[in-house]
From Swiss-Prot:
Protein's gene: prfA
SUPFAM superfamilies: Release factor
Name of protein: Peptide chain release factor 1
Post-translational modification: Methylated by PrmC. Methylation increases the termination efficiency of RF1.
Disulfide pattern: none
GO CC terms in record: cytoplasm
Gene3D superfamilies: 3.30.160.20, 3.30.70.1660, 6.10.140.1950
Entry-annotated residues carrying N5-methylglutamine: Q237
Annotated family: Belongs to the prokaryotic/mitochondrial release factor family.
Top-level taxon: Bacteria
Organism from which the protein derives: Pseudomonas fluorescens (strain SBW25)
């Protein structure tokens, strides 16, 4: 393991001991803000320190086993050979774990998100598939205890959505959904197809982290056009509806956002402004992210909206993620909310890219 990583681990171990003492201090315990902050840091540092302690113990075991390789007793030497092999395997595993634990954290991972799903090529079938994708993410959210609120929707003529925008709130939402942005393709026989021919349609998904108030982009009110309108429609589980809605146009960029979630215009405006800030921030950061991804020849993590990332083939019950050459024959389970089957391999690939960058 690199000396720089070992130095960082030593610093974290000292900090862990300091945090342990602080959390037992009466003055800290009486200050709830400090206590929460230190408790959060303790929870982040503790597993790293525990793994580091395990690594140092295995290193000591390895040194002891290597010393026994010189023993005069052939049985002891034979046993030592096996112990050395096991210790080296364990060391490699623990070093890999620690490297992953020390990877830079995405500051947006813990944020809520704005989820945008739009029908692309394929007409009515694309709109129906947009509805399928929204249900998939809603069911995934239910499994994780997240809350989904529709902000804006434009229903398709034969079901689904031409466009649906939702806010997803919960723990580590962006960290889980950030690689869902891109073009999702479906191959199936539409219900309206009398000849039984397979059609190909597509939808685009965008996942934008919700900025907090301190980090929200400052927007000049003179750059905005605000329209109000009345909205109605059928709601579903975890979805709030309203009679009043707001549409905000950011004139310099042409970005339009609308919200019909809350019953008060004031709340709708606040939510729409937060969404607008997220879109403007995404506009600024996506170009830089694409440049980095292109330079390092990455697909996972580029966030390119035009990139075809996944195909859902109903005839074969197959889901293929093209970025990591992942093919799963569990379409029904994934559409029922089992999206982790695709998300976890993507996160693993992203971490591998980060580790490779550290080694460059």
């Amino acid at each position: 393991m690199k000396a720089s990583l070992l130095n960082k681990l030593d610093v974290l171990q000292d900090r862990f001991e300091e945090l342990t003492a602080l959390l037992g201090d009466g003055e800290v315990i009486s200050d709830q803000a400090k206590f929460r902050a230190y408790s959060k840091e303790y929870a982040e540092v503790e597993p790293i320190v525990a793994t580091y302690k395990h690594l140092t113990k295995v290193q000591a075991d390895l040194e002891g086993a290597q010393a026994l390789l010189k023993d005069s007793d052939p049985d002891m030497r034979e046993m030592a050979v096996e112990e050395v092999r096991e210790a080296k395997e364990k060391l490699a595993e623990l070093e890999g774990d620690l490297q992953r634990m020390l990877l830079p954290k995405d500051p947006n991972d813990g944020r809520n998100v704005f989820l945008e799903i739009r029908a692309g090529t394929g007409g009515d079938e694309a709109a129906i598939f947009s509805g399928d994708l929204f249900r998939m993410y809603s069911r995934y959210a239910e499994r994780r205890g997240w809350r989904v609120e529709i902000l804006s929707e434009n229903e398709g003529e034969h079901g689904g959505y031409k466009e649906v925008i939702a806010r997803v709130e919960g723990d580590n939402v962006y960290g889980k959904l950030k690689f869902e942005s891109g073009a999702h393709r479906v191959q199936r026989v539409p219900a309206t197809e009398s000849q039984g021919r397979i059609h190909t349609s597509a939808c685009t998904v965008a996942v934008l982290p919700e900025p907090d108030e301190q980090e929200a982009i400052e927007i000049n009110p003179a750059d905005l056009r605000v329209d109000t309108y009345r909205s109605s429609g059928a709601g579903g589980q975890h979805v709030n509806k309203t009679d009043s809605a707001i549409r905000i146009t950011h004139l310099p960029s042409g970005i339009v956002v609308e919200c019909q979630e809350e019953r008060s215009q004031h709340k709708n405006r606040a939510r729409a402004m937060s969404w607008l800030s997220a879109k403007l921030n995404d506009q600024q950061t996506s170009a830089a992210a694409n440049a980095i991804a292109s330079e390092r020849k990455l697909l996972v993590g580029s966030g390119d909206r035009s990139e075809r990332i996944r195909t859902y083939n109903f005839a074969q019950g197959r889901v293929t993620d093209h970025r990591v050459n992942l093919t799963l024959y569990s379409l029904d389970e994934i559409l029922a909310g089992g999206v982790d089957a695709v998300i976890e391999p993507l996160l693993a690939e992203y971490q591998a890219d980060q580790l490779a960058a550290i080694g460059e």
